[in-house]
């Protein structure tokens, strides 16, 4: 079995996690699930970076020790990944004793090899970036030298330092990237890296004496004033977490196929420093370095000073974990910057998740129950729908091909093209007409095609939306496993099925007409204030009705037995409803824009049973179905538990 490693960067504990951290970690979790289904033994590693001058300063401001401060923030990161149900195998902290031993041992190896030497460093140091700036690159403004990367003021420092001979690895690095053109994705990021290397590499300062919070040098170096600088310390986590130099469980076997997920701001460190360190230690180089962009908020870069830093956990609690996963992975081409807005999130939920996929499953389950008592045979699919089946398989294979290329948005786009195709096929074939015309064999072939396509799609959907995919597969009495992936997704085996009802995959969300800006009250808050004010306002006398009037209204539980469209009307449906009276009542209801007729059969509803009969479009209506409508959609009111048709509601 192929062993592999998928990593996030270890997150710096100078602040709590935000949506950028969540995005990186969700990508890693997606790849873990994708490659696990393909049969790989994947080790998914994340963690926290806890050393450095910024941590020392942040702890001092809070009257804490650096370790106590790091403990508190690291716990927040770990708790957030647990909230998101992320399937990580290791959570490393650079304050772990085993990591410290690994870094010290690696330092000794590199020193004895001659790749580390002692010297002195003079330059403008940026505390925020934890690095020195070349004087020629720094921006000299009003006698202040600003960091060219973050534009914060730097400090002129001169200190003794140990250096790594990065300059010796220019050619090996260029040779590696020439032989492995897709080692960095997107590929244009690799071109940036090779261009930087070709300009010439300077040796790298890897220790500091200006602060104490870091890993001390090995005792045999006899140089206690030095601590290992953040990048040698931090990058070695990918090896120390697997037991490098102390590998009792043979975890380092995963290291030979490593995929690192990083943001574009730390590309240089991972694409130049890290492979050079690996070459020095005679360790295998990574298989892929996958580099994503940044998220802005309503077009503005996230900033604590602007108050627009987004907490991914709060968003997920409001809109759903699966829904947020889908949005982040679908909305933006991997590698590019993306803009987050609640309005766009809601549009994705309603259009793609609720309408395209959720309603498709609901319609299928309703028709399978109505026409075939949940049981579908696949034997006639190829006789009636061979071209359609081939089309579905072509789209699924195409979607699958995008994941190893890190084109995750395209994979999801193609996957949802399957659902769009199936919805259009229902509209074209009109299964209710097939049933009316007694074309039972063709109808069963159509529904079985849709069922098999949905089942097969669930195995790719699983990487992106695991809980939704499991629910989808469960509707077809199938589990998401590597064996079933081989059987249904790769081999495209068609299956006779007994379908089972499942709760809706998604819920429709209310649209936000005006997006929330930093410093403004949210739409949710405004709505709550309006609601509170409305509740506090006294009712006008003419709005009251007496209890005797209310008692006249007879509301009963009804079971919809039949549902049909009414010719020449796009709003009305003809429903036959069982109210426990020994006959079916005909009720004309204006819900055709929100419900397909076949999806209503078998649904429990609330009916005003003693309404005076009236004619609508020439059809007699003997009651009213109760529903609730907002500005965008309508929903039927149903009992939360199954009741006997005709039960009186009081």
UniProtKB/Swiss-Prot annotation:
Which cofactor does the UniProt annotation name?
Zn(2+)
User: For this protein, what does the record note about how its cofactor is bound?
Assistant: Binds 1 zinc ion per subunit.
- Quote the InterPro entries the UniProt record gives: Met-tRNA-synth_bsu_C, Met-tRNA_synth, Met-tRNA_synth_2, Methionyl/Leucyl_tRNA_Synth, MetRS_core, NA-bd_OB-fold, Rossmann-like_a/b/a_fold, tRNA-bd_dom
Q: Where in the cell is it found?
A: Cytoplasm
Nucleotide-binding listed as a keyword:
yes
Q: What are the GO cellular component annotations?
A: cytoplasm
Binding locations of Zn(2+) = 126, 129, 147, 150
What this protein is reported to do is described as:
Is required not only for elongation of protein synthesis but also for the initiation of all mRNA translation through initiator tRNA(fMet) aminoacylation.
What this protein is called in its record is Methionine--tRNA ligase
Q: Which organism is it from?
A: Helicobacter pylori (strain ATCC 700392 / 26695)
